[in-house]
Amino acid sequence: MALTVEQKAEILKEHGRKENDTGSPEVQVALLSANINGLQDHFKGHKKDHHSRRGLIRMVNQRRKLLDYLAKKDRTRYLQLIEKLGLRR
């Protein structure tokens, strides 16, 4: 469910603009996407876990807001990111 330190470091290295970049929208969206994918797998076996589902919805909304921000500020970075992550928008 939660990402390990190694998984986070791999995402930072792959999507970061600099070495220790944790604040750029690309990194934040990639981390949220990894968490969302983990929670979706969790719900396949725990259908009635509504408490975690609330957290999932919150993460999806946060990712949507960050993607909207990135699309408004820099359309090319936005298009590259959704293609790299395989998001449909």
From Swiss-Prot:
- Give me the disulphide-bonded residues: none
Alphabetized, the UniProt keywords read: Ribonucleoprotein, Ribosomal protein, RNA-binding, rRNA-binding
User: What SUPFAM superfamilies does the entry give?
Assistant: S15/NS1 RNA-binding domain
Give any single GO term for biological process.
translation
Quaternary state and interactors: Part of the 30S ribosomal subunit. Forms a bridge to the 50S subunit in the 70S ribosome, contacting the 23S rRNA.
Main function: One of the primary rRNA binding proteins, it binds directly to 16S rRNA where it helps nucleate assembly of the platform of the 30S subunit by binding and bridging several RNA helices of the 16S rRNA. Forms an intersubunit bridge (bridge B4) with the 23S rRNA of the 50S subunit in the ribosome.
Q: NCBIfam families, per this entry?
A: S15_bact
Q: Which family does it belong to?
A: Belongs to the universal ribosomal protein uS15 family.
What protein name is recorded for this chain?
Answer: Small ribosomal subunit protein uS15
The root-end lineage is: Bacteria, Pseudomonadati, Pseudomonadota, Gammaproteobacteria, Oceanospirillales
